[in-house]
C-alpha cells in the first residue's frame, strides 16, 4: 500500500523505515528514503522520531525551519519577523519570510544539534537561534570547581551543547572531544563560520558596548528605555529576573509594540529569508 499525506500526525507516527520524503526541485521531484538516514544515524534517530511524534511537528511539510530555545522565542519570533520585514531588513523580494511556510521548532541548545544531520538529509534551510550561555570555573558550595553561569565579559566557555558541537565540527574535531572551547573563539565567529550547508546558527552578539547571554538579556540591552536602564550600565544590569519567560515575551509584545529586535536575530532571519526555495 502506498499512502501520500499532508498530515503531520500521520507522518510523525510512521516508522522512519517506511517513510519516503518527496521534495520539489528545479529538476522535478526528489524522493528520499528516511531509512537511509536512520541507518546512517542510529544514535539520533530515536530522539528525532520521538520528538517529532510528541510535538506534532510539521518539519516534513515546511520549506524552511527555525529552531528556538524556548517559550520567549516561540512567542516573539512571528512578531520579530514582521518587524524585520517592515523595517526593510529583508530587502525587496517576492515572498518575504512571513509569507513562506516555515516550521518554528522549540528545542533547547542542549538538543538542537541532534537535528542538524536530519536537516542536512532533508535539504531544508534551517536557522538555529540559541543562547551564548557563558560560564566560568567557580568554586561551588562543596568546595569543588564547577561551571557557573556568568556574564559574557567574565565567561571562559559556553555550556551550550549545540554551539560546542558546531565549533568542534568547524575545527574538524569529533563529537566526543572534550577539550575546552574558549568563549572568545565563539564570539569571534564570522557569518561564514556560522553557516554549514543549509544550516545557520545565531546567538547573542555585542550591542551598545554590552553582550547578553540570553534572549531576554539581549532584548533588555537594546530596549533600555523600556526597562528603565540607562546608558551607564554593566552586563550585570541586563540580568533577567522575576517574571516567567512567557510573561516577559507577552509583556514586551503588549506594552512595547515599538521594541527593537536584537542584531543576532535580525541577521539570522535575513540569512533564512535569503535562502531560495522552489517558487
Regions found by a protein language model. Give the residues of each.
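Switch/communication elements of ASCE P-loop NTPase nucleotide-binding domains
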Residues: 1-55, 258-266, 270-279
Amino acid at each position: 500500500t502506498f499512502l501520500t499525506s499532508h498530515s503531520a500526525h500521520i507522518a510523525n507516527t510512521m516508522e522512519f523505515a517506511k517513510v519516503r520524503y518527496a521534495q520539489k526541485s528545479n529538476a522535478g521531484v526528489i524522493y528520499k528514503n528516511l531509512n537511509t538516514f536512520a541507518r546512517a544515524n542510529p544514535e539520533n534517530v530515536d530522539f528525532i522520531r520521538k520528538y517529532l511524534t510528541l510535538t506534532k511537528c510539521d518539519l516534513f511539510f515546511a520549506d524552511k525551519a527555525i529552531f528556538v530555545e524556548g517559550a520567549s522565542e516561540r512567542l516573539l519570533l512571528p512578531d520579530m519577523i514582521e518587524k524585520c520585514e517592515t523595517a526593510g531588513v529583508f530587502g525587496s523580494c517576492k515572498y518575504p519570510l512571513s509569507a513562506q511556510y516555515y516550521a518554528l521548532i522549540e528545542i533547547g541548545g542542549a538538543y538542537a544539534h541532534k537535528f542538524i544531520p536530519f536537516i542536512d538529509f532533508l535539504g531544508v534551510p534551517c536557522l538555529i537561534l540559541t543562547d551564548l550561555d557563558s560560564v566560568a570555573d567557580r568554586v561551588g558550595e562543596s568546595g569543588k570547581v564547577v561551571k557557573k553561569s556568568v556574564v559574557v565579559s567574565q565567561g571562559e566557555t559556553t555550556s551550550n551543547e549545540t554551539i560546542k558541537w558546531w565549533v568542534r565540527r568547524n575545527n574538524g574535531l569529533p563529537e566526543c572531544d572534550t577539550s575546552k572551547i574558549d568563549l572568545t573563539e565563539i564570539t569571534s565567529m564570522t557569518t561564514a563560520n556560522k553557516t554549514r550547508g543549509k544550516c545557520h546558527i545565531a546567538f547573542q552578539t555585542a550591542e551598545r558596548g554590552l553582550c547578553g547571554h540570553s534572549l531576554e538579556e539581549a532584548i533588555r540591552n537594546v530596549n533600555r528605555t523600556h526597562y528603565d536602564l540607562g546608558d551607564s550600565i554593566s552586563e550585570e544590569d541586563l540580568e533577567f529576573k522575576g517574571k516567567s519567560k512567557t510573561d516577559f515575551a507577552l509583556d514586551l509584545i503588549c506594552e512595547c509594540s515599538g521594541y527593537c529586535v536584537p542584531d543576532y536575530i535580525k541577521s539570522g532571519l535575513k540569512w533564512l529569508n535569503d535562502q531560495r526555495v522552489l517558487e
